[in-house]
A protein has these predicted regions:
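Ribokinase/PfkB-type carbohydrate-kinase core domain
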Residues: 2-138, 160-171
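Short glycine/threonine-rich catalytic loop with a Thr-x-Gly-x-Asp
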Residues: 138-159, 172
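Short arginine-rich
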Residues: 175
Length: 175
């Protein structure tokens, strides 16, 4: 079983009875963020969730730390001010910002709307940006087998170990 702990939370591939963890179930690691389901209990305050998940609004109304994986364009109805971090690829981000193609401009516009948001933008150049109100980091791919789904898993595993954003970005991109 694979697990990474952050306070009382974990990403686990197998459900354990009576666990005090956030359980994310999926058949294998590479597909973890494609179609995952989140199981939440009252002791876990960190949630990793797709923006089309039917339980998202409930998590946004709680005191959870929400990591939001953007999988479709319909977010205008969501209050992103309650989201800690969003993961979005350039195609989706461009559509959110009226077709703008410049990655740095997309990041700037998202942060203008939501100043406390942390954004991880996966580019079509085989790399990724991290941006928050204090810094911006770009990490280009150093190897030639960039996989966007594996990027998400590796980034989150690093973040849950309380590594810096720079370290998490590097580990996500360089699989």
């Amino acid at each position: 079983m694979y697990s990474t702990f952050f306070s009382f939370c974990a990403i686990v591939l197998e459900k354990e009875a009576n666990s005090m963890e956030l359980n994310v179930r999926e058949e294998n690691l590479r597909n973890l963020f494609k179609q995952f389901q989140v199981e939440h209990n009252e002791n876990c305050k960190t949630v990793f969730i797709d923006n089309n998940d039917e339980d998202l609004k409930n998590y946004l109304n709680e005191s959870s730390t929400v990591y939001l994986h953007m999988v479709d364009y319909e977010i205008k109805h969501l209050d992103l001010s309650k989201v800690n971090t969003i993961f979005v690829n350039k195609e989706y981000a461009s559509k959110l910002e009226n077709g703008i193609q410049d990655e740095q401009r997309i990041l700037e516009l998202l942060l203008n709307k939501y100043p406390n948001l942390r954004v991880v933008l996966i580019t079509d150049k085989k790399g990724a940006y991290y941006k928050d109100k204090d810094m911006m980091i770009y990490q280009k791919e150093l190897v030639s087998n960039f996989d966007k789904d594996l990027f998400l898993v590796k980034y989150m595993a690093s973040e849950l170990k309380e590594n810096s954003e720079m370290t998490s970005l590097y580990r996500g991109v360089n699989q």
